[in-house]
């Protein structure tokens, strides 16, 4: 049994004044004119009551169960509390009598669990309330509503089914495999709204989606001697996502992304490029609607206005396979660890590259690939001609393979031998050097595909390389 209470309170106060009598003064009271003043207070709290029970029978059969109820200040009082539970069981097959003669299996465990979890992260502390902003207009002050309330907002609930196996073979190879099926109900998202209402969206529970996948971990002790050890650990995950149901309408379009029933979350929704017209140098698009928005057989056009209603789902960020490889080496007092990560499949939309290829505007930094632009009739290229104030749509051609391989961490350490530790009466002394974010191999140039869920890359920095030295001392 347990109880938790968490509260966050943020206070902000800012002011600006001008007209100091002379330099070197830092107190606002010394200035003559108040230029700006603002303040803000945010509060968020969550309270939880929880319980858990575990049962072990004969070191073979294990059963566990949990129940909790959580209350969040982000929801209206009628739907503030959510109830969540889980049940799990495991069977150590290797402990059964019929397995005692199988010497090469050190451990074999089957396990399964089912349960639910809650999520209240809607991106706002006051999602169920209608907020207003105080504004100045001329010489008068007033208040304007800047968000819509939704008192029906409630917890997002995740129901998880996990089935797995753990094994230790030949006292050298460890294997773990787990299948998971995660069903998310009452998704918390901002629902788009007609801008004629004065608001572009409002927070809502918009539907449900499912994630199905497999996680596999294998660790093998390649060399296992008294002086030298080498252990290789490989992790691989595969996941498939599908939106099952959306409230009110079958799709939600947000910029270059779409939430559509039957598709993966944050799928790319873009016009399809038909290349560059070799006669005119204009960007061509595949469309299936005419100027009256009627469906017609697919054809090519350079009329960018027709692409709005002819966009297609052309991919998503979710990789086919992702994971890591870790090599651990030990030789006498030295230890070396090398961590690498990888991702195979999925696409990303590189907005930075796209802006540098939009060669129709002056004053922009152009990418070197703009040199491939169309220049005269008959040129075959994928970059349209330079034309002042031309409108070019982002298309599937701007998607980039998001696969990557990264050397994330290398750590080299040395631990003093027990002989020396006994002399100085210390338990352990280890010195080490660490390097993080060493190298990244990817189709993206300068940006990092590892830390983005939507698949859209903006003006963000890639993780910096970090080098550090340290010492661990235990008395």
Residue ranges, per PLM feature:
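Short loop/turn motifs that connect adjacent beta-strands in outer-membrane beta-barrel proteins
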Residues: 60, 94-108, 172, 223-230, ...
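Outer-membrane beta-barrel and related beta-rich outer-membrane complex signature
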Residues: 5-21, 75-79, 101-103, 116-130, ...
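C-terminal beta-signal and terminal closure region of outer-membrane beta-barrel proteins
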Residues: 34, 127, 206-211, 256-282, ...
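Extracytoplasmic gating/loop element in the C-terminal half of outer-membrane beta-barrel translocons
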Residues: 72, 343-431, 435
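Outer-membrane beta-barrel signature, preferentially recognizing the C-terminal barrel domain
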Residues: 33-50, 135-175, 202-225, 262-267, ...
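Surface-exposed extracellular loop regions of Gram-negative outer-membrane beta-barrel proteins
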Residues: 1, 44-76, 80-95, 158-159, ...
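Conserved small-residue
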Residues: 204, 223-317
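Surface-exposed loop/turn segments flanking beta-strands in extracellular/periplasmic regions
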Residues: 9-39, 124-149, 195-202, 253-264, ...
């Amino acid at each position: 049994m347990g109880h938790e209470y968490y509260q966050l309170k943020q206070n902000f106060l800012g002011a600006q004044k001008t007209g100091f009598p002379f330099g070197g003064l830092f107190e606002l009271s010394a200035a003559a004119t108040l230029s700006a003043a603002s303040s803000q207070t945010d509060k968020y709290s969550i309270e939880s009551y929880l319980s858990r029970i575990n049962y072990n029978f004969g070191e073979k059969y294990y059963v566990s169960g949990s129940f909790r109820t959580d209350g969040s200040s982000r929801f209206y009082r009628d739907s503030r509390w959510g109830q969540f539970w889980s049940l799990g069981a495991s069977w150590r097959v290797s402990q059964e009598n019929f397995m005692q003669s199988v010497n090469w299996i050190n451990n074999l465990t089957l396990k399964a669990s089912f349960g639910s979890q809650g999520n209240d992260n809607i991106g706002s502390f006051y999602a169920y309330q209608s907020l207003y902003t105080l504004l100045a207009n001329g010489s008068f002050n007033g208040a304007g509503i800047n968000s819509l309330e939704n008192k029906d907002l409630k917890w997002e609930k995740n129901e998880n089914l996990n089935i797995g196996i753990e094994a230790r073979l030949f006292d050298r190879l460890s294997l773990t495999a787990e299948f998971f099926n995660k069903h998310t109900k009452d998704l918390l998202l901002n629902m788009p709204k007609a801008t004629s209402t004065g608001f572009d969206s409002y927070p809502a529970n918009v539907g449900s989606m499912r994630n199905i996948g497999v996680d596999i971990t294998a660790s093998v002790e390649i060399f296992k001697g008294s002086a030298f050890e080498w252990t290789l650990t490989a992790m691989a995950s595969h996941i498939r996502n599908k939106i099952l149901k959306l409230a009110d309408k079958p799709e939600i379009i947000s910029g270059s992304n779409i939430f559509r029933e039957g598709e993966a979350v944050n799928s790319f929704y873009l016009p399809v490029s038909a290349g560059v017209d070799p006669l005119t140098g204009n960007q061509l698009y595949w469309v299936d609607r005419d100027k009256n928005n009627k469906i017609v057989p697919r054809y090519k056009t350079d009329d960018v206005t027709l692409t709005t209603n002819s966009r297609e789902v052309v991919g998503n960020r979710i990789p086919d396979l992702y994971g890591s490889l870790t090599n651990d080496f030990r030789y006498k007092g030295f230890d070396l660890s090398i961590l690498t990560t990888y991702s195979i499949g999925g696409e990303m939309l590189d907005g930075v590259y796209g802006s540098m290829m939009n060669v129709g505007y002056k004053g922009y930094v152009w990418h070197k690939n703009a040199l491939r632009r169309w220049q005269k009739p008959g040129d075959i290229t994928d970059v349209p001609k330079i034309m002042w104030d031309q409108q070019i749509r982002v298309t599937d051609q701007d998607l980039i393979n998001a696969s990557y391989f990264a050397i994330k961490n290398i750590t080299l350490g040395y631990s003093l031998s027990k002989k020396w530790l006994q002399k100085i009466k210390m338990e352990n002394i280890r010195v080490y050097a660490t390097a993080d974010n060493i190298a990244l191999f990817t189709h993206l140039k300068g940006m990092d595909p590892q830390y983005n869920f939507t698949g859209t890359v903006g003006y963000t920095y890639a993780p910096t390389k970090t080098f550090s030295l340290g010492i661990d001392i235990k008395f």
